[in-house]
């Protein structure tokens, strides 16, 4: 006898009735329906609070396959289509069953027919591959909306006011007029020969070693580099309005930071070099052995990280202004005025960043962190070596002075100034093993000759003849003023 294909009888859905008791009633694990535990309290915003399933009348949970249904009818319809079960469904009562939330599991055929009758769409049920593709599309749409929202938020951020634009233009012009070689530095730079500064060869009195040839090259550019920082500051009205004493303290504190920033933004990843003063391209070891020690690592790392920001001249200029107007310097008189000036530059800086609309997420806070890195990495790197003669950075004393960390500040410089006569000439014999002159003595003489050590030079009151003459009494008085300010700045 030919056996008829088995049919699924009414109420025998294997997925919905797998946990039935002998009396035909559905068991509930742990006394609670899993569906209700997972969906409890969830109502989509487009549904009314007590909206019912159009198939069985149970509480609806959403819009499924073009109809508002409960989770049970949604799952039943999906399984039926995915597994192609509807040809096997049958009804004992001539397809006349009433489907509600109590009887819905007793006749699969009538339940399926009602799903079709109320408008549930079979073509919206996806197989596994289509479902994966749909989820991918959903994720893409979410990402697109996220980007659109970010663009809208950027467009809504405030841009510079007319007053801030004036501040920005002045700072930008001050930077461009004092930035050696400008945007043409790559074409005009000269690489320091590889045989210079590759190995520390001369022992200094403090036990460190330095390549004097590299040091000699650096001393040729240090005076104009410091002078350009001073000129930049003097072109800012907010700085020029400060007392002369505060101007000197601010310049002493920021000189190394600004010169390091100017070198860092001229980092070239192809040659792995920094271009100092817009003209001399040096490698890490050359900078380190030429007198800068471990700080060279901090400047190179800063250059690498800043290269991703693609800063323009205005952003570099405003960053320098923020570094200049720092109230962290000891001995300041007009702290409130300086703090307000820094806040004005910070606000203009933030609004200008909004104006440029960088593609880097969270560009502004990241850039602020870099500003703090300029200070912390340069000023406090190697703090464990604070007791050494080279100061808190673990750098040779001549290296610290070479790039303006102290300018006229700290016991190293004061000790050297005691070796200078009133006319600026060196006292005492020059040791033969220290080259014709000690690097410290050479640098100090350079700073005296350039007028960097004189308060009148900083405040714009110097006479050209007085600035060039170290033998005049006025220069000696100015030097004493700077020494006094340096002592205040160095003391806590």
Curated annotation (Swiss-Prot):
Membrane keyword on record: no
Protein name, per record: Thyroid hormone receptor alpha
Keyword Phosphoprotein belongs to the record: no
Subunit description: Binds DNA as a dimer; homodimer and heterodimer with RXRB. Interacts with NCOA3 and NCOA6 coactivators, leading to a strong increase of transcription of target genes. Probably interacts with SFPQ. Interacts with AKAP13. Interacts with C1D. Interacts with TP53INP2. Interacts with PER2. Isoform alpha-2 and isoform alpha-1 interact with TACC1, but the interaction with alpha-1 is much weaker. The interaction with isoform alpha-1, but not alpha-2, is decreased in the presence of thyroid hormone T3.
Recorded family membership: Belongs to the nuclear hormone receptor family. NR1 subfamily.
Keywords: Cytoplasm, DNA-binding, Metal-binding, Nucleus, Receptor, Transcription, Transcription regulation, Zinc, Zinc-finger
Record region (Disordered): 1-33, 457-492
DNA-binding region (UniProt annotation): 53-127
GO biological process terms, semicolon-separated: animal organ morphogenesis; cartilage condensation; erythrocyte differentiation; female courtship behavior; hormone-mediated signaling pathway; learning or memory; mRNA transcription by RNA polymerase II; negative regulation of DNA-templated transcription
Binding site for Zn(2+) 1: 53, 56, 70, 73
Binding site for Zn(2+) 2: 91, 97, 107, 110
Span of domain NR LBD: 163-407
Pfam family, one: Hormone_recep
């Amino acid at each position: 006898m030919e056996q008829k294909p088995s049919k699924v009888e009414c109420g025998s859905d294997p997925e919905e009735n797998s946990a039935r008791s002998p009396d035909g009633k559905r068991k509930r694990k742990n006394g609670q329906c899993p569906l209700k535990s997972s969906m409890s309290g969830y109502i989509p915003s487009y549904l009314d609070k007590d909206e019912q399933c159009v198939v069985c009348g149970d509480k609806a949970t959403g819009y499924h396959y073009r109809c508002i249904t409960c989770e049970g009818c949604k799952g039943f319809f999906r399984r039926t289509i995915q597994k192609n079960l509807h040809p096997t469904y049958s009804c004992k009562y001539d397809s006349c069953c009433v489907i509600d939330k109590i009887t819905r599991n007793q006749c699969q055929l009538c339940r399926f027919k009602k799903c079709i009758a109320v408008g549930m769409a079979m073509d919206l049920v996806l197989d596994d591959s289509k479902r994966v593709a749909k989820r991918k599309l959903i994720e893409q749409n979410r990402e697109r909306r996220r980007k659109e929202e970010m663009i809208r938020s950027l467009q809504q951020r405030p841009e510079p006011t007319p007053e801030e634009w004036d501040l920005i233009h002045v700072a930008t012009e001050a930077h461009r007029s004092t930035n050696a070689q400008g945007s043409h530095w790559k074409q005009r730079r000269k690489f320091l020969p590889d045989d210079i500064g590759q190995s520390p060869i001369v022992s200094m009195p403090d036990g460190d070693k330095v390549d004097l040839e590299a040091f000699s090259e650096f001393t040729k550019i240090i005076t104009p580099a410091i002078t350009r920082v001073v000129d930049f500051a003097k072109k800012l009205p907010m700085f020029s309005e400060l007392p002369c004493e505060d101007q000197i303290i601010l310049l002493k504190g920021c000189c190394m930071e600004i010169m390091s920033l100017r070198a860092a933004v001229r980092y070239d990843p192809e040659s792995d070099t920094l271009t100092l003063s817009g003209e001399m391209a040096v490698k890490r070891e050359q900078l380190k052995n030429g007198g800068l020690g471990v700080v060279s690592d901090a400047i190179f790392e800063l250059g690498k990280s800043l290269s991703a920001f693609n800063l323009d001249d205005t952003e570099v200029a405003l960053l320098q202004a923020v570094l200049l107007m720092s109230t962290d310097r000891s001995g300041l008189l007009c702290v409130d005025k300086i703090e307000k000036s820094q806040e004005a530059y910070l606000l203009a800086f933030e609004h200008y960043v909004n104006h440029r609309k960088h593609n880097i997420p969270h560009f502004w806070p990241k850039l602020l962190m870099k500003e703090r890195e300029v200070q912390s990495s340069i000023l406090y790197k190697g703090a464990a070596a604070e007791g050494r003669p080279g100061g808190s950075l673990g750098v040779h004393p001549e290296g610290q002075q070479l790039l303006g960390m102290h300018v006229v500040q700290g016991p190293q410089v004061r000790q050297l100034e005691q070796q200078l006569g009133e006319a600026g000439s060196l006292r005492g014999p020059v040791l033969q093993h220290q080259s014709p002159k000690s690097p410290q003595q050479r640098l100090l003489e350079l700073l005296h000759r350039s007028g960097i050590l004189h308060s009148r030079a900083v405040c714009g009151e110097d006479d050209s003849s007085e600035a060039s003459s170290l033998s005049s009494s006025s220069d000696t008085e100015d030097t004493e003023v700077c020494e006094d300010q340096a002592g205040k700045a160095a003391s806590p």
